[in-house]
């Protein structure tokens, strides 16, 4: 039997995933982090993107989109806290495309600095959601 690690993914609204995994890949600020059981303790921030979970005895990885957040790793436990998170199967491509279009439109008005920064953050989240949808559907 393969070694496993317990994984909890929690958003402000609810718990999205709680179970064991053989491996987790998370979107760190400086690149993707691959985490296996007995990993060295770690605390870092996450950027918007998809968390991939390889559960024992399953061929397919489970995908959870996170809008950013905090990742804590202990040798036998991974905890991800995110403002918002969505299971990959529940992502809405049309909604993500509309959010991307709206953010790009808002970024055209560079006069409002605060709105521009907000639009940049929204654009990053929309692009990350679309990338998660693409991974889920295994599109090139």
From Swiss-Prot:
The root-end lineage is: Bacteria, Pseudomonadati, Pseudomonadota, Betaproteobacteria, Nitrosomonadales
Spell out the Gene3D superfamilies in the cross-references. Answer: ATP synthase delta/epsilon subunit, C-terminal domain (1.20.5.440), F0F1 ATP synthase delta/epsilon subunit, N-terminal (2.60.15.10)
Could you say which protein family the record assigns here? Belongs to the ATPase epsilon chain family.
Q: Which CDD domains match?
A: F1-ATPase_delta
Quaternary form?
F-type ATPases have 2 components, CF(1) - the catalytic core - and CF(0) - the membrane proton channel. CF(1) has five subunits: alpha(3), beta(3), gamma(1), delta(1), epsilon(1). CF(0) has three main subunits: a, b and c.
Q: Which Pfam families match?
A: ATP-synt_DE, ATP-synt_DE_N
* SUPFAM superfamilies membership: Epsilon subunit of F1F0-ATP synthase C-terminal domain (SSF46604), Epsilon subunit of F1F0-ATP synthase N-terminal domain (SSF51344)
This chain's function reads: Produces ATP from ADP in the presence of a proton gradient across the membrane.
User: Keywords for this entry?
Assistant: ATP synthesis, Cell inner membrane, Cell membrane, CF(1), Hydrogen ion transport, Ion transport, Membrane, Transport
Q: What is this protein called?
A: ATP synthase epsilon chain 2
Q: Which InterPro entries does its entry note? A: ATP_F1_dsu/esu_C_sf (IPR036794), ATP_synth_F1_dsu/esu (IPR001469), ATP_synth_F1_dsu/esu_N (IPR020546), ATP_synth_F1_esu_C (IPR020547), ATPsynth_dsu/esu_N (IPR036771)
* Annotated gene: atpC2
> HAMAP family per the record?
ATP_synth_epsil_bac
Q: Give the UniProt subcellular location, in the record's own words.
A: Cell inner membrane
- UniProt topology in membrane: Peripheral membrane protein
Q: Does the UniProt entry include the keyword rRNA-binding?
A: no
């Amino acid at each position: 039997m393969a070694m496993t690690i317990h994984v909890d993914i929690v958003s402000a609204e609810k718990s999205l995933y709680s179970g064991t995994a053989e491996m987790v890949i998370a979107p760190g600020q400086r690149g993707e982090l691959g985490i296996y059981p007995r990993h060295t303790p770690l605390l870092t921030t996450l950027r918007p993107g998809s968390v991939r979970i390889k559960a024992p005895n399953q061929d397919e990885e489970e995908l959870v989109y996170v809008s950013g957040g905090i990742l804590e790793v202990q040798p036998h436990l991974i905890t991800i806290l995110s403002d918002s998170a969505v299971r990959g199967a529940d992502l809405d491509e049309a909604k993500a495309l509309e959010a991307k279009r709206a953010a790009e439109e808002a970024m055209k008005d560079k006069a409002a600095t605060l709105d521009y920064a907000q639009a940049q953050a929204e654009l990053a989240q929309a692009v990350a959601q679309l990338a998660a949808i693409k991974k889920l559907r295994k599109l090139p």
